[in-house]
Amino acid sequence: MSKKIVTFGEIMLRLTTPDNLRIQQSHDFLVNYGGSEANVAISIANFGGEVEYITRLPDNALGETCIAELRSHNIGTKHILFGGHRLGTYYMEKAAAMRNSNVIYDRENSSFSELKPGMINWREIFKDASIFHWSGIDAALTPGLAEVCKEAIDIAKEMGLTISYDINYRKNLWNYGKTAQEVLRPLMTSSDIMFGSEGEYALVTG
């Protein structure tokens, strides 16, 4: 069986204040592209693994830059979808002295968040893969994405893939009327490998 690993998630534009400044003090931002599942893909590629990243990007210069960034790390991008108009963005103040880090998300109505079941050809993607990796962030964003996660997990399980799951609980992302417990507990039962702290596990299992 192929050793290819498939990761699924949202790659985002990160705008970081320079020199430990607050957002209110900044006139410039440092630009990076990344995300939890993209970082997993980069780590796999850095260790010499074969990895394919699945996401949806806007068909513009920002989306093209994300593709270039992923390819620079030898990550497969041939199954990435294009559509929608927005790249998820977040603004970051790094921790400094007695101050905690601060993150402001702007990802509502992003290209990724508009994904629905049936839009991704999982059978084609999984036919030469052995592991599927997803995270709780994916299911936290919208009900449609929670259904996409279930769709991917069900097909991966049917096709004999090992399923890797990062709990990655983010309280502030669960805003569509369902709790993490309601959504994630059924999805977790099909996972073979799980990452997370004891606290995260307790939160999503009750």
Residue locations for each model-derived region?
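General beta-strand structural signal in soluble alpha/beta enzymes
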Residues: 7-8, 79, 105, 164-165, ...
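Short, glycine/charged-enriched secondary-structure capping and boundary segments
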Residues: 20-23, 67-69, 119-120, 146-149, ...
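Conserved N-terminal subdomain of the carbohydrate kinase-like
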Residues: 50-136
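Conserved beta-alpha-beta core of the PfkB/ribokinase-like small-molecule kinase fold
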Residues: 131, 137-206
